[in-house]
Amino acid sequence: WQLPYIKAISQHHQTNIDLIVREKTQAQNILKDLKHINQIFYNDFRKGIFYWLDVFKLKKIFDTEKYDYVYILDKVNKPAIAAKLSGIQNIIAPGIKNQKKWITSKNYLNEDDWNLNYSEQSQKFLKINSIKLNDKFPSLEIDTERLKQGNDDLLVKGKKIAFGVD
């Protein structure tokens, strides 16, 4: 659901971008053919003692990759804290609740925006940061030749039915 907003940020900066997501998203496999994504890192978003381990894992990624901008499309604090610890000058996020302590952007959502759904929050977030959104609908690019390799189970003749839930 965040794909249109990720693409808009890529187009805004005229560069391919890196993503950091939970491993359970399987993004390295599912999103590998999207041309506006450079590379995908996995990081957990856990609580308790693991919270700080995850922050320092993010910091290591930020230090290694030397990003100029970190965009966060959710209310989470970990990437903002890690970016701040890494000295990143442009930390841009919705700024909901405590997150605004860690971001550098002065344009963030207000507390009433917390009641919007995630897509509406992201759309408003882009708008207040002057990022043009060309298409609100997510789309995937799939290299079908690559998909055929090692996926014989998907190449079944006849009807196939898929059911997806979140």
Task: Tell me the role of every PLM-derived stretch.
Residues 1-166:
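Catalytic machinery of carbohydrate-active enzymes
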